[in-house]
């Protein structure tokens, strides 16, 4: 399977290049960066700490996509939305791990899924997706006397909050209780907020150091508390998850899929 890595010079992009090199049946077919990037023309494999592959970083997705089967996209919303149109036109499988996507961004992504297979998830790791399944079941089993709080921590360079994974876990809790997350989410409390409302789903974000990703979902009830947690020790778990998603989507009918579909989980 021939794959393009979008954002090839970033932390996740370099991890994806390494994951492709470690995955049987996967080949690096292209490396994409923004036109103004100083990495244009550099060997993508060398940037990832590997022997030279001859695949140079380019800003031209249209040309790269002529000899590719899919694109792995962990970039920023504006870049992902620009890539969506080209991927759909070329019929590329599009694996999207970009976080911070708005409702309008998701509408654009959905609009192309009649033409190609898209796998979109706030987190590509097996552990987090299993955690989401557990959170949904826990929320189904516990009534609103158990307050739900989602706590996440990431490295100092992360630019969006709450993380896509935190929102995914909050959505799992909302789905378990059959409520809308938009109506129940409370983000970043500060000042005189008043008492907590029953049924709220709270979010808190921490930033610092080099943390790849820590997430906890707390169910706080009368006189007891249940905490479900996941700690990512290396971003390679996300990269290998993205490879798994791409291989799973190869040959699938056009549509919008999630990692729950890839892993066969009921979330």
From Swiss-Prot:
Record: active site: 154 (proton donor/acceptor), 158 (proton donor)
GO aspect biological process, one term: diaminopimelate biosynthetic process
SUPFAM superfamilies assigned to the protein according to its UniProt record, in alphabetical order: Glyceraldehyde-3-phosphate dehydrogenase-like, C-terminal domain (SSF55347), NAD(P)-binding Rossmann-fold domains (SSF51735)
Superkingdom field: Bacteria
Keywords, alphabetical: Amino-acid biosynthesis, Cytoplasm, Diaminopimelate biosynthesis, Lysine biosynthesis, NAD, NADP, Oxidoreductase
Oxidoreductase recorded as keyword: yes
Enzyme Commission number(s): 1.17.1.8
Family annotation (InterPro entries): DapB_C, DapB_N, DapB_N_CS, DHDPR_bac, NAD(P)-bd_dom_sf
Gene: dapB
Cell compartment(s), UniProt: Cytoplasm
UniProt catalytic activity: (S)-2,3,4,5-tetrahydrodipicolinate + NAD(+) + H2O = (2S,4S)-4-hydroxy-2,3,4,5-tetrahydrodipicolinate + NADH + H(+); (S)-2,3,4,5-tetrahydrodipicolinate + NADP(+) + H2O = (2S,4S)-4-hydroxy-2,3,4,5-tetrahydrodipicolinate + NADPH + H(+)
Protein source organism: Nitrobacter winogradskyi (strain ATCC 25391 / DSM 10237 / CIP 104748 / NCIMB 11846 / Nb-255)
Sequence positions that bind NAD(+): 7-12, 33, 97-99, 121-124
Pathway: Amino-acid biosynthesis; L-lysine biosynthesis via DAP pathway; (S)-tetrahydrodipicolinate from L-aspartate: step 4/4
Function: Catalyzes the conversion of 4-hydroxy-tetrahydrodipicolinate (HTPA) to tetrahydrodipicolinate.
GO CC annotations on file: cytosol
GO molecular function, one term: oxidoreductase activity, acting on CH or CH2 groups, NAD or NADP as acceptor
Similarity comment: family membership: Belongs to the DapB family.
Record protein name field: 4-hydroxy-tetrahydrodipicolinate reductase
Annotated binding of (S)-2,3,4,5-tetrahydrodipicolinate, by residue: 155, 164-165
